[in-house]
Curated annotation (Swiss-Prot):
Keyword tags: ATP-binding, Magnesium, Multifunctional enzyme, Nucleotide-binding, Nucleotidyltransferase, Transferase
GO cellular component: cytosol
The protein's name: Bifunctional glutamine synthetase adenylyltransferase/adenylyl-removing enzyme
Function field: Involved in the regulation of glutamine synthetase GlnA, a key enzyme in the process to assimilate ammonia. When cellular nitrogen levels are high, the C-terminal adenylyl transferase (AT) inactivates GlnA by covalent transfer of an adenylyl group from ATP to specific tyrosine residue of GlnA, thus reducing its activity. Conversely, when nitrogen levels are low, the N-terminal adenylyl removase (AR) activates GlnA by removing the adenylyl group by phosphorolysis, increasing its activity.
Region of interest (Adenylyl removase), ranges: 1-440
Cofactors named for this entry: Mg(2+)
Reactions catalysed, as given in the entry: [glutamine synthetase]-O(4)-(5'-adenylyl)-L-tyrosine + phosphate = [glutamine synthetase]-L-tyrosine + ADP; [glutamine synthetase]-L-tyrosine + ATP = [glutamine synthetase]-O(4)-(5'-adenylyl)-L-tyrosine + diphosphate
UniProt-listed Enzyme Commission number(s): 2.7.7.89, 2.7.7.42
Native source species: Salmonella paratyphi B (strain ATCC BAA-1250 / SPB7)
Species classification: Bacteria, Pseudomonadati, Pseudomonadota, Gammaproteobacteria, Enterobacterales
A single BP term in Gene Ontology: regulation of glutamine family amino acid metabolic process
Lineage: superkingdom: Bacteria
Family annotation (NCBIfam families): PRK11072.1
Amino acid sequence: MTPLSSPLSQYWQTVVERLPEGFTETSLSAQAKSVLTFSDFALDSVIAHPEWLAELESASPQADEWRHYAGWLQEALAGVCDDASLMRELRFFRRRIMVRIAWAQTLSLVDDETILQQLSHLAETLIVGARDWLYAACCREWGTPCNPQGVPQPLLILGMGKLGGGELNFSSDIDLIFAWPEHGETRGGRRELDNAQFFTRLGQRLIKALDQPTMDGFVYRVDMRLRPFGDSGPLVLSFAALEDYYQEQGRDWERYAMVKARLMGDNDDAWSRELRAMLRPFVFRRYIDFSVIQSLRNMKGMIAREVRRRGLKDNIKLGAGGIREIEFIVQVFQLIRGGREPSLQSRSLLPTLDAIAALHLLPENDVAQLRVAYLFLRRLENLLQSINDEQTQTLPADDLNRARLAWGMKAENWPQLVGELTDHMANVRRVFNELIGDDEADTPQEEERSEPWREVWQDALQEDDSTPVLAHLADEDRRQVLTLIADFRKELDKRPIGPRGRQVLDQLMPHLLADVCSREDAAVTLSRITPLLAGIVTRTTYLELLSEFPGALKHLIMLCAASPMIASQLARYPLLLDELLDPGTLYQPTATDAYRDELRQYLLRVPEEDEEQQLEALRQFKQAQLLRIAAADIAGTLPVMKVSDHLTWLAEAMIDAVVQQAWTQMVARYGQPAHLDERQGRGFAVVGYGKLGGWELGYSSDLDLIFLHDCPMDVMTNGEREIDGRQFYLRLAQRIMHLFSTRTSSGILYEVDARLRPSGAAGMLVTSADAFADYQQHEAWTWEHQALVRARVVYGDPQLTSQFDTVRRTIMTTARDGKTLQTEVREMREKMRAHLGNKHRDRFDIKADEGGITDIEFIAQYLVLRYAHEKPKLTRWSDNVRILELLAQNGIMDEHEAQALTVAYTTLRDELHHLALQELPGHVAQTCFSKERALVQASWRKWLVAV
C-alpha cells in the first residue's frame, strides 16, 4: 500500500477531529487511515455506522464477494413489510456495500475490472431484489398477471449502457427498459387489472423504490428515456409492442444503445430467451453493415459539439480522448461486423477489444493502448466519484482532491498524473481520428490564395490605403471593408484573448477575408460577420472550428450574406456554428415527422433531473433546427408552406417535451390525479390556436395555447403531498408556461399567449373539457368561434382530443343567421384595423392592411361558420390553404377564386418569411402586390360587404 502523500498526511488531522468517540488514531489500521483520508463518502458512512469499520478491519473485502450480494440482500429484506421499509433497507444495503467497494478500490485490494463487475452486480442485485419484492406485493393487491392461457407473466428488465455491459461506475445512474411478454389480466386478486395497468403500476413503484430521495438518500437515479418513444411512451411494453417498434421505427442510435442491453437477474427462462432472440436482429445485421459509417460520423460530430457546448476540457468521459471515444471505437466494429462475427457481440468493452485484436481489425499496439487507457480512465473516474459518491467526470480544481487522486492513481503528484492522463487520452484520440477521421485541411493552392489577405489583416491598412486584392471593389465598399477590419482589430484589443486565440485568429482571418471580399456585397457581409467573430474571440474552440473546417466557413459567409437574422442568431448563440459542419443536414431540415425523435435523442445527453440543463438543451435544439429551416429557405429547397410546416412540427415537438418535463416534475412532487388509475393517458391536452393551429408559424411567431383537462371534481393526487386533482392541472399549466418563458443563456423557448382561453385573461389558465364545451356553446363571442376554426389539439391523449374535436365540430356546424354573422365578422375586422392599423401610411402592411393576409383569414373563417351546417366537411382542416380547397370542393366558392386567394395568401406569407430573414418589418412599398391586394379586396366585398 502506498503511504499517504504529505498533503494527505496533513489532512488526516482534520479527519481525526471528526471521528466519533471510541475511535482513536492508534486503534485504526494504516488501511483505514488511507481510506478515510481519501473518501469523504467512506468517512461519513463509518461515522454513521461504526460497525461497518470494525467489519472491514476484521475481514477485508474479497474479489468474488459479489457472488454473495443476492443472499445478503435476501437476509436484509426478510423482515420488510411495506414499501417504506423496503426503501430504507435498499438504501442501507447499497451504502454498506458501496463502502466495501470504495475500501477495496482505494487500497487496490482487487483489480479495476473486478471493481466494475462488483458495482454492476450490486446494482443488478438491488434492482432484482426490489422488483421481486414489489411484484409479490402487487400480486397480493391485484392478483397475478397472466396470459389468456393462465400462464403467469413476469416483469423483465433490460439494463442498458454500462449496467448492461457490467461496467457501471461508482456513482452512476441506471438506464432501464421494462417489458412483459403477453397481454391478459390479473387473476386471484381483490380486483382485476389488465396486464398493461399491472406492470405500469409495478414499474412506477419500482422506480420510486430505487430513485426517490429519502432521509436515507436514494439507491440509484433511474433513467427510463431509452425505452421506445422515451418519456412520451408507455412505461412498460409488451413483447409485441417492442418488436413492432424496433422493426418499424428503431433508430440507429437505439441500435447503439441496445448493443449493451442485458436482462437483469435469472435470465435463462423461456421468456428471456424469446426477448433476446427478438432483439438480436435489430442490433446485429447479418451482413457487414457499412451503412452505419455515416451515422457514426454524425455521432462523432455530436461528441465534438457536446464537448464544445459544455466546455468539457477537463472531462475524462466526454473530452477528446476520453472514455466515450473508446466506447465509440469499439461500437464501430460491433455495429459494422457484429452480425457476421459473434465474438464482437459481447456487451462488455474489454472482451470486445480482445475480439477486435483477434480479428486484426486494429493493430495490436492500438488495442493494447486502448485497453491500458480504458482501465486507467475507469479507475480515475471511479476514484473521483468515490470521494463524495458524486456523479462527475470533471477533474477537480482544488488541491485536496487533486492530491487524493494523485495518491489513488499512484502518481508522485498532480502534474505527474496529468501527464500520464494526457498521454493516454492522446493515444485514444489518435485511434479515434484515424478510424473515421474526416477533418479538412488546406491545400497549397488555398494557402497561396490567402497569402495577400494575410497582409490586409496583419498590416492594419487605413481606409484610404490601396491594396491590389481590393481593387475590384467600388471605392465606397473598399473604404467600408478596411474600416470594418480596423474597427474589428481595435475591438480585439479590448478582449482578453490568449496567445492560442490570437494564433488561430491570424490563421482564420486571411481565409475569411479572401472569401468575403470576392463577393459584390463584401462590405455588408463583413459587417454581419465581425460582430459574430467579436463574440467568439475568447472562445478558441469556435475559432478553431472555422479555421479547421473551410466548408463551415464558406457556409457561414453565405448564410450571413443572405440573412442578417441568421447572422444575429449565430452571433447571439455561437453554439449554432456546429450546424455548419455538415451541409447534408444544414440545408436538409429534419423530416417533419422526426422532430420528436430527434429532440428525444438530443435530450438523452442531459441528466433528466438537471432542470437547468434540460431548459438549455431545449432552447439549443430549437435554435439549431431554426437555422436549418432558414438555411433551406434561403437555398430555395423549401417552399413557403413547407417552411411553416417545419416550424409548426418543431413547435409541436417542443410542446411535447415541455409537457413531459412539467408532468414529470409535478408527479414527482404530488403524484398523479387518482382518476388516471382507471384510464390510459394523462387527462390533459394542449390546444393550438392561430398560426400554430393553422400550420402557419413564422420564424418569430409566438404560440397561442389553451389547456384542457378531464379531471372530475373531488379527485385527489396519489402522492405523498396530496393535492386536489384540478389544482394539479392548474399547477401543471403554470409549470408549462414557466418552462417556455424562463430566460436562460440561450434565451426563452417561445412567447406563449394563453388569452384565447374561455373568459380570456380573467379565466382559469386550465379548463375542464366540459366547461370548455359549455362556454363555447353559451358564452363565446363570434370572434372566439372564428378563432376555433384555426384550432386543433397539438398535445393530448386520444380521449381528450376526440372530445375537443367534437366540441369544435359542433360549434362550427351550428346554423347561424348569415346577415348577423356577416356584420359581426366585418365589424371585428374593422375594430382590429383601427386598433392595429398601419402606422406607415405610405407603406402596405402585408398582414394588417386591406387586401392583406388577415382579410383572407377572415373570409375563410366567415365562410366556414356560415356554411358548415350545410357542409360539415368544411370543419376538417384548420389551415387556410386547405380550408380554401374545401370551400371550392364543396361548391361554396368558385374554384378559380379559391385558387387565386391561395396564391395571394402564399405569396404574401412568403414575403413575410423573407422580410423576417432580413430582419425587416412586415410592410412594403404601396406599389407592391397590387394585383394580389385587388383580388383579396374584391373577395372581401363579395362575401362580407355585399347584401
